[in-house]
């Protein structure tokens, strides 16, 4: 099912059958050699967060010592933060050394040498980037951050229970020995209602791995230029924010407030209760009411200045390049360039002038408890890519960042009818329904599900035996979109885009479509043949090109079959917001355009992320859709409601999302006993 789900969309970029075969052979290797490589990769990373064996001996003579100079700048006990630019030079050097290895065996030998010299987390990040981007490792499974650092995702009480059992030497054969399904409900903190979302293992792992697929430190000298990387930064984080808003509204909470003033107290406190057992690093608690403070080399005023420069360039239409020239951002590439500026990645037009707004805000927020290092306090979760999305402040900050992108989008003209409708074909959406597996038409049920996370043997807290941890997450029933489309011309290929958004705002009022578009979540994107006359298209929720399967999160990675997966994508069990017991009305929107008009022409030489192409793009791959991400809801809409805005190739339906409150056991739960 997983391979079929993306074939329809991935095929957009494949020009001829021979090319398709070549790419598949390159990216989807299942032979014995690839299995050997995967075992070697897993062997390298397996010891990153574990004590090094006293018998280990690093290879000698595989790399000149002078090439290793400068490595080890970041101390081993510290957290590696991709947000902290001070780490970028060392991380970039490690990535380059790993990519420059002449063949796979040399790559493994170089990795064995480097991992002893550098910070463990920095090595894991650089090694993962290299595995994803080397030609001789594409298509292989990349180690998942939660497999290597489960203590970044499991709270201290769970880790301590694992440690107690391990110290007793008890052996349990595939039994979930630790129950971590308790979700707190602290009525003193409204955000505790969102713990199931904020602290979800798959969500936070996705955020980390997305930054592996699209590294801020990537430059064209390392390989092919990343296609639409800046736009992906905008769109993926915009979608994380929109999904967070839907979860808040499902729980009767107002949308999150935008971060606005650097001198205002932050009302939301956050206590992560996570620490790294091997090093003792404990993520700092942020009490409510704290105010962001200057760092020794980074005053808040610098952040304000960078933001003003970006906004001035947006409103004036003139951007300053590092070579001293000025230029206007065009409609097609403007959002991509702006994304690189705001992130700010090494491909920013002018990092000296526009600075590093997004990343350094994470650093300032992460060091709020001890900005000068006076008390030796560890940083908070906002400092770490793997943990930052746990904090409600993450979404307030990204709403601020998203507003900058919307300032740019608001300078673009609304789409015309001609731009919204196919020019060489006539499609009419005549009806849409959503059919749940067990519920009434246009109703989708959600519930809790337990899943088993394997914690491997050899950690400080699992020295003697592996363990299973039972975790609790949201889940929804399978459902099918049924879309009736009339094609009034010859046989064509339709390009389907599906979005969803809450029907009412937090006051119970119908949205102005221009406000509703800002919280649209992308549900799916795919192509389908449309024959003359009426066509009934059925699309299953499991096939979404937005999501990665829960098996990619919870299954033993060594047992997964490599299908060119990037382990990137939104967790499939979070595709639908929680909803509520009464029924949370969501509007599902569909637009059908002509694939021939939207496809990207030209050969491609890389691999796509087959598990979630829409959110993650590809490795060395052109994104196979020339339309802006979020089309047709990415630009301002002057009409008041959807009915006034829509064209004949669009439609919508209201769907009730009902939370049942039930809890479903893992599919293989009984097999563990």
From Swiss-Prot:
Tissue distribution of the protein: Hemolymph.
Source species, domain of life: Eukaryota
Record: residues binding Cu cation B: 358, 362, 398
Molecular-function annotations in GO: metal ion binding; oxidoreductase activity; oxygen carrier activity
Subunit structure: 36-chain polymer consisting of 6 hexamers, each of which includes 4 different chains, A, B, C and D.
Function comment: Hemocyanins are copper-containing oxygen carriers occurring freely dissolved in the hemolymph of many mollusks and arthropods.
Record protein name field: Hemocyanin subunit C
Organism: Scutigera coleoptrata (House centipede)
Biological classification of the source: Eukaryota, Metazoa, Ecdysozoa, Arthropoda, Myriapoda
């Amino acid at each position: 099912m997983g391979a079929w789900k993306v074939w329809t969309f991935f095929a957009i970029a494949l020009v001829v059958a021979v090319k398709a075969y070549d790419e598949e052979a390159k990216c989807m290797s299942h032979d014995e050699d690839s299995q050997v490589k995967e075992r070697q990769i897993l062997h390298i990373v397996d010891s990153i967060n574990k004590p090094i064996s006293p018998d280990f001996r690093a290879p000698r003579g595989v790399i000149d010592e002078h090439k290793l100079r400068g490595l080890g700048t970041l101390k081993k006990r510290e957290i590696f933060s991709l947000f902290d630019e001070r780490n970028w030079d060392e991380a970039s050097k490690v990535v380059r050394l790993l990519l420059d290895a002449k063949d796979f065996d040399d790559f493994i030998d170089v990795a064995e040498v480097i991992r002893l010299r550098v910070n463990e987390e920095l090595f894991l990040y650089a090694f993962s980037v290299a595995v994803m981007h080397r030609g001789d490792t594409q298509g292989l499974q990349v180690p998942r951050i939660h497999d290597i650092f489960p203590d970044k995702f499991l709270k201290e009480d769970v880790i301590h229970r694992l440690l107690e059992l391990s110290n007793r030497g008890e052996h349990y054969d595939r039994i979930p020995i630790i129950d971590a399904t308790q979700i707190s409900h602290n009525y003193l903190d409204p955000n505790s209602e969102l713990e199931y979302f904020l602290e979800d293992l798959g969500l936070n792992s996705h955020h980390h791995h997305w930054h592996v697929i699209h590294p801020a430190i990537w430059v064209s000298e390392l390989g092919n230029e990343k296609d639409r990387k800046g736009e992906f930064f905008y769109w993926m984080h915009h979608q994380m924010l929109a999904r967070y808003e839907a979860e808040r509204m499902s729980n009767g909470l107002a949308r999150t407030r935008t971060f606005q003033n650097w001198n205002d107290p932050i009302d939301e406190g956050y206590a992560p209760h996570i620490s790294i057992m091997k090093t003792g690093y404990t993520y700092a608690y942020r009490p409510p009411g704290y105010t962001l403070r200057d760092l020794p080399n980074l005053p808040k005023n610098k952040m304000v200045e960078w933001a003003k420069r970006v906004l001035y360039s947006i409103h004036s239409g003139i951007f300053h390049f590092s070579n001293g020239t000025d230029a206007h951002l065009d409609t097609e590439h403007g959002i991509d360039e702006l994304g690189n500026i705001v992130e700010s990645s090494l491909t920013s037009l002018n990092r000296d002038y526009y600075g590093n707004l997004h990343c350094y805000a994470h650093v300032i927020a992460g060091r709020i408890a001890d900005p000068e290092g006076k008390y030796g306090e560890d940083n908070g979760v906002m400092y770490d890519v793997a943990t930052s999305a746990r904090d409600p402040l993450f979404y307030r900050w990204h709403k601020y960042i998203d507003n900058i992108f919307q300032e740019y989008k608001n300078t673009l003209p609304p789409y015309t009818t001609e731009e919204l409708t196919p020019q060489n074909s006539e499609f009419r959406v005549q009806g849409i329904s959503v059919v749940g597996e067990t519920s009434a038409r246009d109703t989708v049920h959600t519930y809790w599900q337990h899943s088993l996370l394997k914690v491997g043997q050899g950690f400080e807290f699992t020295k003697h035996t592996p363990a299973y941890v039972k975790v609790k997450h949201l889940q929804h029933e399978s459902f099918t979109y049924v879309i009736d489309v009339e094609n009034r011309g010859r046989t064509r290929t339709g390009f389907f885009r599906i979005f969803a958004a809450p029907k009412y705002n937090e006051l119970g009022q119908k949205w102005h479509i221009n406000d509703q578009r800002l919280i649209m979540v992308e549900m799916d994107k795919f192509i389908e043949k449309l024959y003359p006359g009426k066509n009934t298209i059925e699309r299953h929720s499991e096939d979404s090109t937005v999501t990665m399967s829960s098996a990619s999160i919870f299954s033993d990675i060594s047992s997964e079959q490599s299908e060119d997966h990037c382990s990137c994508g939104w967790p499939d069990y979070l595709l639908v917001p929680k909803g509520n017991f009464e029924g949370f009305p969501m509007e599902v929107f569909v637009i059908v355009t002509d694939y021939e008009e939207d496809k990207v022409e030209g050969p491609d030489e890389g691999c796509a992320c087959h598990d979630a192409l829409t959110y993650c793009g590809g490795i060395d791959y052109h994104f196979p859709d020339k339309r802006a991400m979020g089309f047709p809801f990415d630009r301002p809409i002057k009409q008041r409601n959807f009915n006034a805005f829509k064209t004949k190739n669009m439609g919508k339906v209201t769907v009730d999302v009902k939370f049942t409150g039930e809890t479903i056991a893992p599919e293989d739960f009984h097999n563990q006993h």
